Amino acid sequence: MHCRSVRYASWSAAALLWLAAIPAPAQITVTELQTPYSFISSQSGKDYFISNVNGEPDQADNNGFITKLDANGKLVSLKFIEGGKSDVTLHAPKGMALVEQTLYVADLDTLRAFDAASGKPVATIAVSSGSAPSSVRLTDVAFDGKSILYCSDQKANRIYRVELPSQKVTVLVTDPVLAGPAGLAVHPKSGQVIAVSWDKGKILEITPEGAVTELFSNGFFSSRFTNLRGVDFDRWGNMYVSDFTTGKVWRMTWDKRFQVIAEYLPSPGDLGIDRTNNLILVPYEYAHAAEMNGLETPSGSRSKQEKRTLADYGFIPPPPKPPAEGAVKK
């Protein structure tokens, strides 16, 4: 289990409860993030990137920027990539994905590509569903590890497929059941696309052919999720999702157990998992901040620290308490 924890904070008091993290002796604070949306790492775990909308999420104001951190979580450049500077166009950067040394960024109706080492623009991919490109509003992008990027359009209930290196864009699926697809991830083992729903708090699986299956949804008597923003997986196949409105980060284990690993968070956004270093990366949009924390390493033995269960949140009835020793049964 990692003992490294790096916190970026611009708020004075935030109630944070990381149930699976270890307190760390070192902290680094950055107070100049502006509406951070997404937080990702390179595959090697040596570079980290945070997208900053810096204003209205749908406005073409060319003032968005990307923050870069080094392997130790220290600031390399607050505005490593900045809209309006050095021939860069970047309006409201949201979700990101790294393909080798190329950083792809969802920016309104365009997928922009930058060199991850220099920050220089290398490609611009216009995304259109056949209607006016300006109607497209991309929220996230995910890479399948081979040659395909997937992009979500939350407002249109649509997911796009982008082929590399040809940059051919097609609509993978448009379906109301997606209910505002915000965050995307590709399952590291199955290769299926996972989308989380902003409108109805659903988690969905989409095949490479575009077939949609609901994995988790709120029931009539229980509502686990409200407005889901981010999703990613650790190296063991556990899924992590952020609930923007309730301020919680959930873990769904491979055997479908639900665990709240953090709560009372200020607007947790499009989270990422650094699988190399076993870290969780969470941006806080309204707090203009972001945080890195170590994740618990799965173990065959039971942890000495009692973890919270679904019973604590009313999702399943708690097991009956055993009778006191020596009690007389009637």
Give residue ranges: language-model regions:
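A short beta-strand motif characteristic of beta-propeller blades
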Residues: 27-30, 75-87, 120-132, 168-174, ...
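Beta-rich, blade/repeat-based domains predominating
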Residues: 33-45, 56, 61, 84-101, ...
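Short, conserved, GDST-rich strand-edge loop motifs in beta-rich repeat architectures
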Residues: 50-62, 289-300
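Short glycine/acidic-enriched loop and turn motifs that connect beta-strands
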Residues: 54-58, 110, 156-157, 200-202, ...
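WD40 beta-propeller blade core
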Residues: 67, 112-113, 160, 204, ...
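Short loop/turn segments that connect beta-strands within beta-propeller blades
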Residues: 70-74, 115-120, 163-167, 207-211, ...
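Blade-level signature of beta-propeller repeat domains, shared across WD40, Kelch, NHL, RCC1
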Residues: 268-318
